[in-house]
Amino acid sequence: MRYTNPDALVSTKWLAEHLSSPNIRMVDATSYMPGQGKDGRSQYNEQHIPGAVYFDINDIADETIPLPHMIPPPEKFASKVRKLGLGNGNKIVVYDANGGFLAAARVWWMFRLYGHTDVCLLDGGLPKWLAEERPIEDTKPAQRDRHFTSRMNNTLVRSVEQVIANIETGKEQVIDARSSGRFKGEEPEPRPSAKVGHIPGSMNLPFNSLMNPKEHFTYRSADEIKAAVDKAGIDLTKPITASCGSGVTACVLAFGLYLIGHENAAVYDGSWSEWGNHPDTPVDQGE
């Protein structure tokens, strides 16, 4: 079995050969959890792939909502990415400092959400790039505003109200990207949470089961991803909504599913940061 959408994932070799292509734009999306003692923007300022701009998921967000990095209104997204020099005609290559789950997949999903489909991930991200001793820089590229049009695809995102309603209808499979311990309610959440456990009826597919943790978090083969999906009991012929802690690693699941042909997996944007503190959300624990 091969990837259905192989162009969504580019290799470090491919990017090195296309660094000077005029229509390609690199985006560094590195982001860290509160308390990790690291800052994505600072790391970008120290070293990044030549020509890359920094995309801050906490800045390009709806700051009126008291939840981490919720999606912004379409006009704000368009305004922010224009100022980064990202436009309609660009092929956008997104990476981060840990292979792809420190927000690179989130940014890939966001561009698709707002209608820009010519976007892909760098497999292995910055760690693989550095391991191969490819060029880096610490200077910001010259940026000029580009024309970017947001056309929001609401089929790719879910609200808490929609996920609550789905518990009754069961129309969509809800897939949780968190660890097994967090899913079962046996491990604490990294962010404040009044509840532990999982959304009733959801299935657990930890995001790292789709990746190679010992190989710079590159994505597994199509056969391996399909096997992990099958083992979790997921039916690829039915609609899927991915969830996680705050809407970041859920996008790893959405991306992995996209690679093997399930192209319209939605992401529950608030994820457990919202569900675990909402007064009206039921919770299950255990398997």
Where are these regions (language model features)?
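Cytosolic catalytic domains that perform sulfur/thiol-centered chemistry
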Residues: 1-287
